[in-house]
Amino acid sequence: MRVVPCVHPANRKLPCVRPNYSQLFYQFKGDLRPLAKQFLAKDLATSVNLLQEWLSGIPTPSEQMDHFAPPLQALQENKADSDEKALLMASLLAELAPQYNLSIIYPDISIGSVSPAWLAITADSGLKGDTVVIGNQRHILLTGSPLLAQQMTMAKIPLISEPLY
């Protein structure tokens, strides 16, 4: 099943589903292996920088809560919103650094396709960057706006960390 049920933040009685990011991750990461190899560098930090630079060139439409394009579709359409970019980068980065846990982070008030979303790697990766702490676990943000994550934290909007594997 490519969707999972969720609780609608405004009314528990309303329907709510969101993409099953973990299942989609496993479904598409093998397809992207040849592309991932293009970002292989001397160290993880350089590979991540190359991926981030490449991803920034993909146009970002306004956030789509009622639509989700899996990684291959996002590449074909040459556009991806925050959760689509997060899953695309995760699918590529997992081929280069499978030893580190990756998570999709999103606000708990999200409905449907989460918005906004960030890809994060565990702090034990040694990567430098903006850090978010969720449930006493430090995450390094790899995609999305760190300022927006900080604003949500300051506004007391809880963030959810959904491990991809």
List each model region and its residues:
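A structural boundary/capping signal
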Residues: 1-165
